[in-house]
Amino acid sequence: MTESFFPEFTARPFDADDYLPTFEVPTWLGPPWHQQPGVVHETRELGRSDSTVVLLDGFRCFDEGFLLRIIVRINDRGRQARHRTFAYLERAHGRGYLDERFAPNGLRWGIQYSTSQKATTQDESPYPPDGDLESAVVQGPVIGGNGRPEVHMDSWTRDFWVWPVPPEGLLRIAVEWNERGINETVTTLDAGPIRAAALRSRPLWPES
């Protein structure tokens, strides 16, 4: 028998190193593991032009922040034209935390709390250059991508993590995309349902 391409190995016991402790990340960085969010079914049109519609598609709310879903729908007929638009969104739909290849006329959006605190996709990343998340001091609010975007037919979809939970009052969401003909458009929502949904969030497994 000829020598095997692969070396011999001894199977490692699964109980030796397969235990995965709860992966805790700073609250500004993303949603917590093993927590069931409270959901707000809120759909709004955030911006529109002849070629493009930007939509808000609900909130999933945790005790420290919330995920919101942004959907971009385009009516470009050509496959290559759609590909160019979605490829741009894939690599750059903001600065810093959301990539540094942002085009000045590209999609940008942001949120503002009733306290006048504001975060936009043009903000620099709060991620510390030295990677020391434990000692990083971050001032909210913060917007960050969560997971990979999804593309299907005429739509691009992505979830975004927003930290912290907004205070009582109004939540403003602004969108602008000059290249696609969307002027700056501001949508105002009541933060109350988001706050109530955050209180409904629960751990999936109570601590033993």
Language-model regions, residue ranges each:
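N-terminal onset of structured domains
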Residues: 2-104
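Residue-level recognition of well-ordered beta-strand positions that form the cores
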Residues: 69-73, 110-112, 161, 174-176
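Short acidic/polar inter-strand loop motif in beta-rich domains
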Residues: 77-78, 118, 177-186
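A short secondary-structure junction signal
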Residues: 81-83, 122-124, 183-187
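Extended, solvent-exposed segments with strong compositional bias
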Residues: 103-163
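Internal, hydrophobic beta-strand segments that form the core of beta-sheet-rich folds
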Residues: 167-180
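Main structured recognition or catalytic cores within long modular proteins involved
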Residues: 173, 190-191
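Acidic, serine/threonine- and proline-rich intrinsically disordered appendage/tail regions
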Residues: 194-208
